[in-house]
């Protein structure tokens, strides 16, 4: 899980290798030697301090944890609380750069949309980027996070190469459960 990293500004880089297994050493070497560009994205948010987390103060002494954060866990909490973080959910660094353009949203029936964009590797090294699609409720009938990840796709690109990414979004992708309405 995410931890405090008060020393994070001291090194020139931090390489996060989740569950690398027996191939983790070779993968780390290829990344550090520049043979492969990093392309992972964080699956969690790293706070600046423990006090910045949604669960701070909810773990009193003893064996009982108080889960009071509800839907505001992880990036949903930090977005809603507008808290600064050390490393945000869904972000990661690369040895190359990417440029997005051509965003289009097209209705495909009553409850389906196609969301497209182009992504170009604008840097000098081959690399991969996780294109992420977030949605927000305009007029929710109950509290909702400011945005939620609803789709993503990893795209591998050579320098100068451009690809189109297309997401099929359904009305159900915006659904949430209402405990009061039991639906």
What is each PLM-predicted segment?
Residues 135-137, 169-171, 181:
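A short beta-strand motif that forms part of the nucleic acid-binding face
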Residues 124-141, 147-149:
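Short acidic, flexible loop segments centered on an aromatic residue
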Residues 65-66, 138, 150-152, 182:
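Short, intrinsically disordered/low-complexity patches at protein termini
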Residues 1-128, 134, 159, 179:
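Secreted, periplasmic, or luminal enzymes acting at the cell surface/secretory milieu
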Residues 177-183:
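Glycine/proline-rich low-complexity spacer/linker segments in large multi-domain proteins
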Residues 141-177:
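Intrinsically disordered, low-complexity Pro/Gly/Ser/Thr-rich segments with frequent PxxP/GP/PP motifs
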């Amino acid at each position: 899980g995410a931890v405090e990293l008060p020393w994070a500004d001291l090194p020139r880089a931090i390489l996060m290798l989740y569950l690398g297994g027996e191939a983790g050493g070779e993968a780390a070497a290829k990344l550090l030697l520049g043979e492969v560009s990093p392309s992972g994205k964080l699956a969690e948010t790293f706070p600046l301090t423990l006090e910045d987390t949604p669960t701070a103060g909810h773990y009193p002494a003893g064996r009982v944890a108080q889960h009071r954060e509800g839907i505001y866990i992880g990036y949903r909490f930090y977005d809603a609380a507008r808290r600064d973080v050390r490393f945000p959910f869904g972000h990661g660094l690369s040895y190359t750069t990417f440029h997005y353009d051509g965003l289009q949203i097209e209705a495909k029936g009553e409850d389906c949309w196609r969301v497209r964009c182009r992504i170009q590797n604008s840097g000098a090294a081959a690399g991969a980027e996780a294109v992420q699609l977030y949605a927000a409720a305009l007029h929710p009938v109950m509290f909702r996070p400011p945005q939620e990840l609803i789709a993503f796709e990893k795209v591998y690109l050579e320098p100068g190469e451009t690809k189109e990414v297309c997401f099929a979004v359904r009305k159900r992708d915006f659904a949430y459960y209402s405990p009061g309405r039991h639906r």
